Amino acid sequence: MRQALPLVTRQGDRIAIVSGLRTPFARQATAFHGIPAVDLGKMVVGELLARSEIPADAIEQLVFGQVVQMPEAPNIAREIVLGTGMNVHTDAYSVSRACATSFQAVANVAESLMAGTIRAGIAGGADSSSVLPIGVSKALARVLVDVNKARTTRQRLTLFSRLRLRDLLPVPPAVAEYSTGLRMGDTAEQMAKTYGITREQQDALAHRSHQRAAQAWAEGKLAEEVMTTYVPPYKNPFTEDNNIRGTSTLADYAKLRPAFDRKHGSVTAANSTPLTDGAAAVILMTESRAKELGLRPLGYLRSYAFTAIDVWQDMLLGPAWSTPLALERAGLTMADLTLFDMHEAFAAQTLANLQLLGSERFAREVLGRAQATGEVDDAKFNVLGGSIAYGHPFAATGARMITQTLHELRRRGGGFGLVTACAAGGLGAAMVLEAE
């Protein structure tokens, strides 16, 4: 094992995560229908600051992410600062790393803390699948640019006459990888076939996720980390994730048809994450700054790792690549973990990564490591359910996982937890957290 890389400031301060919060997550076009991501971000950051009672000027930086970009608000982070009553001089910028976006936001704030340029910051992300940037065809876009430069009505009419009826149709956001043309579900199907993952195994994992999430809500474990939201017309509060199927049975999952490979596939809408709206954020500080403000941290960031692999085959293997690196940098092994939380983009993707984490062959032949990262104990794995149940607002999921894992570690008396996710473009992310 290589030498650990401690995440501390020049003064030896650890990176503390003092609090975290999220909105309830809503299926596309339900509770947050018509609410843009920037407003969801304002909701969660405003409430997080109000609950923490931290002086507004104590937050020196806000790093926020959004995957489904809205042209009218390209820097969502700055809009959140301006829309929540934060100090107008607060540094704010936006990041995007697909499904690992808020992992990146947390890493960026942590690096600012370690560099000594700030002592406290907020990281998070928000996405809306209900408010989408509907575009126009390339032909219409080109004509509109040319029309804007045309000098006469005749020139404008000539330009418009080149268009066909189909050129006027709206163009929804792309759901496929730009470089390959493959949808995420196509990659999940690849992985199911490559690693021999059956439909029954996928449905069982999805069912487990929903059952665990429903139980977590029923036992009140999520109440402290999920805010109550009010949206127009402000008649009813929205308080809980609305995708969780607590009363479903395995027989219900078996009824669904494959969603991507219609003839021979095994990936369905039920064993995949749904399109979701929501936001999540965490406050990070140096350990000494938290003490100055009289705050007890939820926990500490022990290490993180980001990886990238080829996109043409089985590209959602980010956790299998980033997990050993994050553990190594933390000076830990899989056996040292109290909790292991993996983003469930698809049941097939999740099961494939779990399989490879325990594979000696994958470790030697692909990662170039002497031994496997280690089998993941089912008693430690996604103990409160995962993204298949909660939903997946792309940029918010990492912050949800971090907050949820730290709260659960505290309930268990402390320990180490690892959170990890795959992401579009063959990217992966993992973070090791510590709670006392």
Curated annotation (Swiss-Prot):
Q: Which reaction does it catalyse?
A: an acyl-CoA + acetyl-CoA = a 3-oxoacyl-CoA + CoA
**Alphabetized GO MF terms:** acetyl-CoA C-acyltransferase activity
**What is the enzyme's main class?**
transferase
Provide the primary localization: cytoplasm
Q: Which InterPro entries match?
A: Ac-CoA_C-AcTrfase_FadI (IPR012806), Thiolase (IPR002155), Thiolase-like (IPR016039), Thiolase_acyl_enz_int_AS (IPR020615), Thiolase_AS (IPR020610), Thiolase_C (IPR020617), Thiolase_CS (IPR020613), Thiolase_N (IPR020616)
Record-annotated membrane-spanning stretches: none
Please give the GO cellular component terms listed in this UniProt entry. Answer: cytosol
Q: Which residues form the signal peptide?
A: none
**Active site positions, chain numbering:** C99, H392, C422
Pfam families according to UniProt: Thiolase_C, Thiolase_N
Q: Write the Enzyme Commission number(s) for this entry.
A: 2.3.1.16
Task: Give the PROSITE patterns listed for this entry.
Answer: THIOLASE_1, THIOLASE_2, THIOLASE_3
Q: In which pathway does it act?
A: Lipid metabolism; fatty acid beta-oxidation
Q: Which GO terms describe its biological process?
A: fatty acid beta-oxidation
Q: Supply the alphabetized keyword list.
A: Acyltransferase, Cytoplasm, Fatty acid metabolism, Lipid degradation, Lipid metabolism, Transferase
Query: What does the subunit comment say?
Result: Heterotetramer of two alpha chains (FadJ) and two beta chains (FadI).
Can you tell me which family this protein belongs to?
Belongs to the thiolase-like superfamily. Thiolase family.
Give the protein's biological function.
Catalyzes the final step of fatty acid oxidation in which acetyl-CoA is released and the CoA ester of a fatty acid two carbons shorter is formed.
> What protein is this chain from?
3-ketoacyl-CoA thiolase
User: Which taxonomic lineage does the organism of this UniProt entry have?
Assistant: Bacteria, Pseudomonadati, Pseudomonadota, Gammaproteobacteria, Enterobacterales
